């Protein structure tokens, strides 16, 4: 057997194995291997395909890594209209729908029929087209007749099979070359939280659905891949006739066999009582799911009857969506606090009489800005209705005016900063008030320090809120540069800071100097500059000097920047406080330049997130980190689903237990040494 044949077989086997593990992870939710082991399989496949490009196929899982830039999304016409479902918030209207369907069926001579009940995902509707089993097109719903072709972006979703196994389809005449799958793209709650944490405060998404819609419109498929979207399938079209697949339940089962995630929480309901039970059960249990669901979809189970019942111009008559009313509770506005963010924005926060809502106790709620207080007509001591819908944080939606107490009083708008006493400013055409004293306001200093130390910035884990508050209150730190001037005795004198804690912080600060230039740019906390923008700026301007000397016009041409961000960047570097901070960071050992990819000794840890816990005998923590980086890896400070391997030394901490719970591979120091 020739070498080429052996290589082809190895590549095909790798693809099968990777696709199998993708299905286990995204569809069945029972992974067999850690992320590290999966990444190694993918890296091996990419390596072989680069060496043997003739063996690359359109359905290779290596295409999921993204990277292609799409300048525009052409329109495509749907083969059948993507109708939206009529929806209701009323169980009585669901019962009316059920009765109406039964009457229509009686006219057709059909007495009893089951309804298929499925969870309604709060996402973005998508159509996938497979030709001879290969994914050839993915499109948004658009206006129902035409949508945007976003195939490149959808190929990055691991829950979208690039090829479906035709052998799993029923052996029935009439199946066409083109098979259509419809469903919903969504973002899990954890991934949504991670995405928002990496964005500037003023650019964060309100809820997972907004984040999903925004992500699918991105022109950079690499960024789409990094945001970890998911796809749930609920519709299958095999032919123009299609009635040989007799039930919707059968379709969902077949979709699962084809490798699609279907939500799994679907069932058949024989009568209105079972429908009501299903809706009632998930009204409570949906909060325990890892993704947002906002209702239940009911469909006549017998697909053959769908055309006989028909549809209106907008929606089918054989289906309805019951949407859960937003969770609401009545409580009392006890006060309004004013928070000052790291950029000086003053945000009013409602202080509420504690009340249970959506499975948790709520005592505070954002009021967004002072215009919102005026719009609501809100007064202190009012009874208010708070609501939790798709938003992460509950919001006040209205005042119960007929229950307004006699002691109600207006909410005063502060004229000075609640933290530093500076006179507040309200820029023209903006709704928020700002504290202009960026250099001295304690709240802004604390906010900037916490951002500088956050996980996606320099990841200084030992630097938490209480410690930052002490450092600022005692005048030890006024900007991030002062952190690197701290001494062990100063730290030991602080509350709850013994010798070991002080040592750990100094070590974490030392290690933070090794973080990349782009992460440092993000850590600076420039308004409107999130992780992606910081990455583009670092690539365009390889030194801080070059970046601060660039004109606004030049900055605006950088991908992901534009005029608003360019002005913000230029304004930031024009301040004397910024220049002082940069001098301190340079003196602390930060190179303040893009060093490019480190020269690798080998690629044994390429693309792997490595975490160390416990004490190592052969190496100090910094030396061990450098060994990983010299082999293409990245050292992280916390355990997550993206951690590839944990190196456990003597006396490991709680991170080891968490790693084992998540199924992350754990190795000893000897095994680590052997991998070098």
From Swiss-Prot:
<dbReference type="InterPro" id="IPR018239">
    <property type="entry name" value="DNA_ligase_AS"/>
</dbReference>
<dbReference type="InterPro" id="IPR004150">
    <property type="entry name" value="NAD_DNA_ligase_OB"/>
</dbReference>
<keyword id="KW-0464">Manganese</keyword>
<dbReference type="GO" id="GO:0006260">
    <property type="term" value="P:DNA replication"/>
</dbReference>
<dbReference type="Pfam" id="PF01653">
    <property type="entry name" value="DNA_ligase_aden"/>
</dbReference>
<dbReference type="InterPro" id="IPR003583">
    <property type="entry name" value="Hlx-hairpin-Hlx_DNA-bd_motif"/>
</dbReference>
<feature type="binding site">
    <location>
        <position position="118"/>
    </location>
    <ligand>
        <name>NAD(+)</name>
    </ligand>
</feature>
<feature type="binding site">
    <location>
        <position position="435"/>
    </location>
    <ligand>
        <name>Zn(2+)</name>
    </ligand>
</feature>
<feature type="binding site">
    <location>
        <position position="184"/>
    </location>
    <ligand>
        <name>NAD(+)</name>
    </ligand>
</feature>
<dbReference type="InterPro" id="IPR041663">
    <property type="entry name" value="DisA/LigA_HHH"/>
</dbReference>
<feature type="binding site">
    <location>
        <begin position="84"/>
        <end position="85"/>
    </location>
    <ligand>
        <name>NAD(+)</name>
    </ligand>
</feature>
<dbReference type="Pfam" id="PF03119">
    <property type="entry name" value="DNA_ligase_ZBD"/>
</dbReference>
<dbReference type="InterPro" id="IPR010994">
    <property type="entry name" value="RuvA_2-like"/>
</dbReference>
<dbReference type="GO" id="GO:0005829">
    <property type="term" value="C:cytosol"/>
</dbReference>
<feature type="binding site">
    <location>
        <position position="299"/>
    </location>
    <ligand>
        <name>NAD(+)</name>
    </ligand>
</feature>
<feature type="binding site">
    <location>
        <position position="323"/>
    </location>
    <ligand>
        <name>NAD(+)</name>
    </ligand>
</feature>
<keyword id="KW-0436">Ligase</keyword>
<comment type="similarity">
    <text>Belongs to the NAD-dependent DNA ligase family. LigA subfamily.</text>
</comment>
<feature type="binding site">
    <location>
        <position position="420"/>
    </location>
    <ligand>
        <name>Zn(2+)</name>
    </ligand>
</feature>
<feature type="binding site">
    <location>
        <position position="141"/>
    </location>
    <ligand>
        <name>NAD(+)</name>
    </ligand>
</feature>
<feature type="binding site">
    <location>
        <position position="417"/>
    </location>
    <ligand>
        <name>Zn(2+)</name>
    </ligand>
</feature>
<dbReference type="InterPro" id="IPR013840">
    <property type="entry name" value="DNAligase_N"/>
</dbReference>
<dbReference type="InterPro" id="IPR012340">
    <property type="entry name" value="NA-bd_OB-fold"/>
</dbReference>
<feature type="binding site">
    <location>
        <begin position="35"/>
        <end position="39"/>
    </location>
    <ligand>
        <name>NAD(+)</name>
    </ligand>
</feature>
<dbReference type="Pfam" id="PF00533">
    <property type="entry name" value="BRCT"/>
</dbReference>
<feature type="active site" description="N6-AMP-lysine intermediate">
    <location>
        <position position="120"/>
    </location>
</feature>
<feature type="domain" description="BRCT">
    <location>
        <begin position="600"/>
        <end position="676"/>
    </location>
</feature>
<dbReference type="GO" id="GO:0046872">
    <property type="term" value="F:metal ion binding"/>
</dbReference>
<keyword id="KW-0520">NAD</keyword>
<comment type="function">
    <text>DNA ligase that catalyzes the formation of phosphodiester linkages between 5'-phosphoryl and 3'-hydroxyl groups in double-stranded DNA using NAD as a coenzyme and as the energy source for the reaction. It is essential for DNA replication and repair of damaged DNA.</text>
</comment>
<keyword id="KW-0862">Zinc</keyword>
<dbReference type="InterPro" id="IPR001679">
    <property type="entry name" value="DNA_ligase"/>
</dbReference>
<protein>
    <recommendedName>
        <fullName>DNA ligase</fullName>
        <ecNumber>6.5.1.2</ecNumber>
    </recommendedName>
</protein>
<keyword id="KW-0460">Magnesium</keyword>
<feature type="binding site">
    <location>
        <position position="441"/>
    </location>
    <ligand>
        <name>Zn(2+)</name>
    </ligand>
</feature>
<dbReference type="Pfam" id="PF03120">
    <property type="entry name" value="DNA_ligase_OB"/>
</dbReference>
<dbReference type="InterPro" id="IPR013839">
    <property type="entry name" value="DNAligase_adenylation"/>
</dbReference>
<dbReference type="Pfam" id="PF22745">
    <property type="entry name" value="Nlig-Ia"/>
</dbReference>
<keyword id="KW-0227">DNA damage</keyword>
<keyword id="KW-0235">DNA replication</keyword>
<keyword id="KW-0234">DNA repair</keyword>
<keyword id="KW-0479">Metal-binding</keyword>
């Amino acid at each position: 057997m020739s070498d080429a044949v052996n290589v082809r077989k190895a590549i095909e086997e790798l693809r099968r194995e990777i696709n199998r593990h993708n299905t286990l992870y995204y569809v069945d939710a029972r992974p067999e291997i850690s992320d590290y082991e999966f990444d190694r399989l993918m890296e091996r496949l990419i390596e072989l395909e680069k060496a043997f490009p003739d063996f690359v196929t359109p359905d290779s899982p290596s295409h999921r890594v993204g990277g292609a830039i799409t300048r525009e999304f052409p329109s495509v016409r749907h083969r059948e209209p993507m109708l939206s479902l009529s929806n209701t918030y009323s169980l009585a209207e669901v019962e009316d729908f059920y009765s109406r369907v039964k009457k229509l069926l009686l006219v057709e001579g059909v007495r009893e029929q089951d309804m298929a009940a499925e969870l309604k995902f709060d996402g973005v509707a998508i159509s996938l087209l497979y030709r001879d089993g290969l994914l050839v097109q993915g499109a948004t719903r658009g206006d129902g007749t035409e949508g945007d072709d976003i195939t490149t972006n959808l190929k990055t979703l691991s829950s979208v099979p690039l090829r479906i196994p035709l052998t799993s389809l029923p052996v029935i005449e009439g199946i066409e070359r083109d098979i259509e799958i419809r469903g919903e793209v969504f973002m899990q709650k954890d991934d949504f939280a991670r995405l928002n944490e990496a964005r500037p405060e003023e650019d964060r998404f309100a809820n997972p659905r907004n984040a999903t819609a925004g992500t699918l419109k991105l022109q950079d498929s690499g960024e789409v891949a990094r945001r970890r979207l998911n796809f749930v399938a609920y519709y299958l079209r095999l032919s123009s006739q299609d009635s040989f697949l007799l039930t919707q339940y059968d379709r969902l089962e077949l979709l699962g066999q084809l490798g699609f995630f279907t939500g799994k929480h679907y069932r058949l309901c024989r009568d209105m009582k079972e429908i009501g039970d299903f809706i009632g059960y998930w009204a409570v249990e949906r909060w325990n799911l890892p993704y947002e669901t906002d209702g239940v979809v009911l469909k006549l189970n017998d697909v053959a009857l769908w055309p006989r019942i028909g549809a209106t111009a907008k929606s089918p008559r054989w289906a309805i969506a019951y949407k859960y009313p937003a969770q609401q509770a009545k409580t009392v506005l006890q006060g309004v606090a004013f928070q000052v963010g790291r950029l000086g924005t003053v945000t009013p926060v409602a202080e509420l009489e504690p009340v249970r809502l959506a499975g948790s106790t709520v005592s505070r709620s954002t009021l967004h800005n002072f215009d919102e207080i005026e719009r609501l007509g809100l007064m202190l001591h009012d009874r208010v209705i708070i609501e939790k819908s798709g938003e992460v944080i509950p919001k006040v939606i209205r005042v119960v005016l007929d229950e307004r107490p006699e002691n109600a009083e207006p909410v005063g708008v502060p004229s000075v900063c609640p933290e530093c006493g500076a006179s507040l400013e309200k820029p023209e055409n903006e709704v928020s008030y700002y504290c202009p004293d960026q250099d001295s306001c304690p709240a802004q200093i604390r906010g900037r320090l916490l951002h500088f130390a956050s996980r996606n910035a320099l990841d200084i884990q030992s630097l938490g809120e209480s410690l930052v508050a002490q450092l600022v209150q005692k005048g030890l730190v006024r900007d991030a540069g002062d952190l690197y001037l701290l001494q062990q005795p100063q730290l030991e004198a602080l509350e709850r800071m013994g010798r070991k804690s002080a040592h750990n912080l100094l070590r974490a600060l030392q290690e933070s100097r090794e973080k990349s230039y782009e992460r440092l740019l993000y850590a600076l906390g420039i308004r409107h500059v999130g992780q992606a923008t910081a990455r583009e700026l670092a690539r365009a301007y390889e030194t801080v000097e070059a970046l601060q000397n660039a004109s606004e016009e030049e900055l605006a041409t950088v991908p992901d920047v534009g005029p608003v961000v360019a002005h913000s960047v230029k304004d930031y570097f024009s301040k004397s406080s910024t220049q002082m901070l940069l001098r301190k960071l340079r003196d602390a050992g930060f190179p303040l330049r893009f060093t490019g990819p480190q020269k690798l000794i080998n690629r044994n840890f390429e693309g792997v997130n490595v975490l160390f816990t416990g004490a190592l005998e052969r190496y100090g923590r910094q030396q061990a980190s450098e060994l990983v980086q010299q082999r293409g890896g990245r050292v992280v400070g916390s355990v997550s689903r993206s951690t590839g391997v944990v190196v456990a030394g003597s006396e490991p901490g709680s991170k080891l237990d968490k790693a084992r719970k998540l199924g992350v591979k754990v190795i000893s120091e000897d095994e680590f040494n052997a991998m070098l």
